[in-house]
Amino acid sequence: MGDSYQVIVDRDASVDQSEHFGSIVLDWLIAERIVEPEASDCALGLGHRPGPGHLKATAEAPRWFMGQATNGMRIVTGRTVFNGWLDSELRCKQCGAVNSIDGLHDAGENWYEGGQGLLACSTCRFGEAITEWQILPPWGFGNLGFQFWNWPWLRDSFVEDISRLLGHRTVLVPGWI
């Protein structure tokens, strides 16, 4: 069956800022009782289990959710390509053409290694950093992510709250392993 995740990716935090902003959001999540303050092995690594206020983040709370061994929130810092779907669609913002994902992995790897990850549209030849392309389902390129393992779908208002708290653009990236 596998595990699913959703990552709220901060698109604007620098590597140097990621731990600071991660702490701000974690403190808020704990204060709102959305996650438990104690870290445990609940997120395929160290994370925070859902707290009694987790319904502020999700639209529902199925019975199975709280009983899962893997159901925590993990903070990921450092330059990361967050993706969960191999069958993605790349859409050019300039002309709207759907492009093959063939160049996506190379551009993502270039970005991960510190480059811009430039990618040119196969139709209009407009070149742009991979971070600015429209990718569906979304991918996230950033230095900070809040990864929620096996949580029911996160509320749009919750994602917006995180964006406001950070003062940055975010993208919600769904995936599974």
Cite the ranges covered by each PLM segment.
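Long, contiguous alpha-helical scaffold regions
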Residues: Q147-I177
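Residues immediately within or flanking Cys/His clusters that coordinate Zn2+
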Residues: D87-E89, L118-C121
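N-terminal alpha-helical interaction blocks
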Residues: M1-L86
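Short cysteine-rich clusters marking metal-coordination/redox-active sites
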Residues: C92-C95, C121-C124
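Short glycine-rich, basic-tinged beta-strand/loop micro-motifs
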Residues: G2-Y5, P137-P152
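Short secondary-structure junctions
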Residues: L26-S40, L104, L165-G175
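Short linker/helix segments within small regulatory modules
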Residues: H105-A120, L136
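Cys/His-rich microdomains that often coordinate metals
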Residues: V98-I101, G127-I130
